[in-house]
Swiss-Prot record:
Localization per Swiss-Prot or TrEMBL: Cell membrane; Vacuole membrane
Stretches assigned to the Extracellular side: 69-77, 150-185, 233-260
Name of this protein: Formate-nitrite transporter
Organism encoding this protein: Plasmodium malariae
UniProt GO cellular component terms: plasma membrane; vacuolar membrane
């Protein structure tokens, strides 16, 4: 059997700490294609787990940011210190998702869309994966918000102003999120998911562990501190705000924020990133796919000859 010399071979064991741009795209398509092989219940479980991780770290970020939202400190530094701490804590969610192989809808908008564009999965299969990941993320985030964040009373309102800063921080974030216009929210969501999808791309491109952690951390930190809109994080934050506050309504949460955020996140991954990458590197993937087909044909022929020789000996 001849060894392939194609430059598009995905080599998991290499002295290189990062992939070439062509190999990164190939890995992205293969990653998206691989999601279609899971059964519905497995996909749902992976998506619920990702939603829980977002909830866990959004809870921790809310507490950390709230501690710096103390009213006397806020008089001097405003929200800047709380935003810094919030953004510094939240990226842990994405590291948890990556390490456990959980399924996040926003990352799928890039990976699964590239697999669709390369015709490695059909439209119905694409919609199945995307819908299950979104529903699972929603279940995980809302369940954590209700059973842990709301159930523990960590964000409950306190009549004592000196002890109400954690509730006030979450409440102010929620009010700000539902104050955007529909178009503003879409634009902020596009900015957010560009960073999130790039974080996924970094994971597929960088082989060095510490480099991977730093690249993912700063990509997610950038969107968190910039005030961008992330659909799964917002599902947790705004549903928790609905549970503990009367300052926002169901209509504001779902139609003024979550709907435009969903649209903007999808535009970022599925259009802004997936289409240009497909246009630039599609021929690289075709070469890789063709090479794999030829290799599989050689393997099958070799196995056929070996079986034929064995039968002749018998």
């Amino acid at each position: 059997m001849q060894k392939s010399t194609s430059k598009y071979v995905i080599d998991p064991i290499s002295i290189k700490t990062n992939c070439s741009s062509e190999e990164s795209y190939i890995r992205c398509v293969e990653y998206g294609k691989g999601k279609a092989h899971y059964r519905n219940l497995i996909l749902l479980a992976k998506a619920i787990l990702a939603g829980v991780f977002v909830g866990v770290c959004a809870h921790a970020s809310g507490i950390a940011g709230g501690l710096f939202y103390y009213h006397k400190l806020r008089e001097y530094v405003g929200i800047s210190m709380s935003a810094f701490v919030y953004g510094f804590t939240f990226p842990i969610a994405f590291l948890c998702i990556i390490c456990t192989g959980s399924d996040l809808f926003t990352g799928n908008t890039l990976a699964v869309t590239t697999a669709l564009l390369q015709k490695k999965l059909g439209l119905l299969c694409y919609m199945r994966v995307m819908c299950i990941s979104l529903v699972g993320n929603y279940i995980g985030a809302v369940a954590f918000a209700f059973f842990v964040s709301y159930g523990s009373g960590a964000f409950s309102i306190n009549t004592d102003t000196s002890k109400n800063h954690i509730f006030q921080f979450l409440n102010d974030i929620a009010i700000k999120k539902v104050s955007h216009s529909f178009i503003e929210c879409i634009c902020l969501a596009i900015g957010c998911n560009i960073f999130v999808c790039l974080a996924v791309y970094f994971v597929l491109s960088i082989k060095d562990g510490s480099g991977l952690v730093f690249s993912v951390f700063f990509a997610v930190y950038a969107f968190a501190i910039a005030g961008y809109e992330h659909i799964i994080a917002n599902i947790y934050t705004l549903n928790l705000a609905l549970m503990i506050s009367n300052d926002i309504s169901f209509t504001q949460v779902y139609f003024k924020n979550l709907l435009p955020t969903l649209i903007g996140n999808y535009i970022a991954g599925g259009l802004v990133l997936a289409f240009p990458l497909f246009f630039i590197y599609r021929s690289c993937y075709y070469d890789y796919d063709k090479m794999n087909d030829e290799l599989n044909t050689v393997v099958l022929k070799t196995l056929s000859l070996e079986l034929q020789n064995e039968s002749n000996h018998i």
